[in-house]
Amino acid sequence: MKKVERFEVPRTIIFGPGALEKTPEVIPPSGRVLIITGKSSTRKYAERVAELLKQNCEIISYDQVELEKPGFDLVIGIGGGRPLDMAKVYSYIHKKPFVAIPTSASHDGIASPYVSFSLTQRFSKYGKISSSPVAIIADTSIILSAPSRLLKAGIGDLLGKIIAVRDWQLAHRLKGEEYSEYAAHLSLTSYKIAVGNAQKIKNFIREEDVRVLVKALIGCGVAMGIAGSSRPCSGSEHLFAHAIEVRVEKEDEVVHGELVALGTIIMAYLHGINWRRIKRIADIIGLPTSLRQANIDVDLALEALTTAHTLRPDRYTILGDGLSREAAKRALEDVELI
């Protein structure tokens, strides 16, 4: 007899220009509301939401959140990855509903139940943090005003889905890991949307361009909710990105989606996938297609490639038990990243 499955996915998703003004239609009277936002530029959106809700709202920057402080009935994350992730952590700890209001679209965290690798490590005492947003409000006019580099990084994150699914299939065949055809299909559909629209949306000058990106990223979040893990959207390409992120002094030195795109090129080569096509798509979008363009030292990339498999020992990927330094260097040379 198969086990009972439980999916946690967003109940309400609204997106489009001016969607922020629809917030009261999505969030009914909820008691005390904690609004977690960025340090500066996104605070004005938090203030507007508080004004619209006409409720007892407390606005706080993501780096000032007191995670153990109770007393809120709803948590809203407004901003990029960090405010949304901290809202998920608070929601998970206190078992309160969480609403995501992204102001950028640089990765699939806008709809995912899960937080970044660094926060997973930092807050490991709380267990496997998972909090699917009950609602997502994506105002495309606001997201369109985000730096184009971050929006392009969102496409970079989507490119990685082909590797994540291939790694998942490999783990299913070789290790007997549970596999969801439905979740994998959703993730691959998001990848296909990115590839199929790359030329058209690459400059992100139209609301429609952002709409395509947001839809694809939300699809990834739903895929993870169905799978009950980040498996359909995070494989060896993400392990490579994480291995670099944990080694840089400041998080702002690198952009997650750009690293994922580079990792996708490398892992496509290892999988025997057409890495040249992926690299061409990345180039069309304007993503870095070499270590130099991404301002990544060769030794750092080699160290990341040879240790990435150790970051999540429970997650089998094409990296297996790890690459030797010689194999890692050959891969970087063959895909012309160096």
Swiss-Prot record:
Sequence positions that bind NAD(+): G81, R82, P83, L84, D85, T103, S104, A105, S106, S112
Any one GO molecular-function label of the UniProt entry: glycerol-1-phosphate dehydrogenase (NAD+) activity
Details of cofactor binding: Binds 1 zinc ion per subunit.
GO biological process, one term: glycerophospholipid metabolic process
Organism whose genome encodes this protein: Pyrobaculum calidifontis (strain DSM 21063 / JCM 11548 / VA1)
Pfam family for this entry, one: Fe-ADH_2
EC number of this enzyme: 1.1.1.261
Superkingdom of the source species: Archaea
GO cellular component terms, A-Z: cytoplasm
Protein name, per record: Glycerol-1-phosphate dehydrogenase [NAD(P)+]
Functional note: Catalyzes the NAD(P)H-dependent reduction of dihydroxyacetonephosphate (DHAP or glycerone phosphate) to glycerol 1-phosphate (G1P). The G1P thus generated is used as the glycerophosphate backbone of phospholipids in the cellular membranes of Archaea.
Cofactor(s), names only, from the UniProt record: Zn(2+)
Family note: Belongs to the glycerol-1-phosphate dehydrogenase family.
Organism lineage string: Archaea, Thermoproteota, Thermoprotei, Thermoproteales, Thermoproteaceae
